[in-house]
Regions:
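Basic/aromatic-rich interaction segments and small domains that mediate binding to polyanionic partners
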Residues: 7-63
Length: 63
């Protein structure tokens, strides 16, 4: 199991997303999966489902 798979089920808070239609800063989401290239699949509290690219997007793992 790689480290990213251990993040499944964790809550994250978006800091900054580089996307044409980004998730707003401070939005909370739950990681529900990791795809083949390492993007984190997230269900956001605003109803959106948008992946996070760990090498590009800034986020914080919540306790």
């Amino acid at each position: 199991m790689n480290l990213q798979n251990e993040l499944i089920g964790k809550k994250i808070r978006m800091v900054k997303m580089l996307d044409p239609y980004p998730i707003e800063p401070n939005t909370i989401g739950e990681i529900w999966g990791v795809d083949d290239i390492g993007q984190l699949k997230v269900r956001w509290e605003n109803g959106r489902s948008l992946s996070v690219i760990p090498e590009i997007d800034e986020f914080e793992i919540q306790d």
